[in-house]
């Protein structure tokens, strides 16, 4: 086998186009976008991106709304913690 790309990774398809800093930003997004994530329902590492913001678990067939490029966003984590805190305050 021929030696594969070391630095550019998935953005090797762009060649020398678009500039190195833009390709670096795109690489970060595309690696997150194509990765598999842990399913919060069945616990398996089987969640893949179906479309922008739609994430599907291939194991339990659940569909979850998330970020466009990542399964969970920082804003979603903030909302979850706020809801949990408000629920605990209401119960107490």
From Swiss-Prot:
Pfam families listed in its UniProt record: Ribosomal_L37ae (PF01780)
InterPro entries per UniProt: Ribosomal_eL37/eL43, Ribosomal_eL43, Ribosomal_protein_eL43, Ribosomal_zn-bd
Ribonucleoprotein among keywords: yes
Gene3D superfamilies referenced in this protein's UniProt entry, alphabetically: 2.20.25.30
Keyword tags: Metal-binding, Ribonucleoprotein, Ribosomal protein, Zinc, Zinc-finger
A GO CC term assigned to this protein in UniProt: cytosolic large ribosomal subunit
Alphabetized GO MF terms: structural constituent of ribosome; zinc ion binding
Stretches annotated zinc finger (C4-type): 39-60
Signal peptide span: none
One GO process term, biological-process aspect: translation
Family matches, as PANTHER family: 60S RIBOSOMAL PROTEIN L37A, LARGE RIBOSOMAL SUBUNIT PROTEIN EL43
Protein family membership: Belongs to the eukaryotic ribosomal protein eL43 family.
Protein name (database record): Large ribosomal subunit protein eL43
Gene name of the encoded protein: RPL43
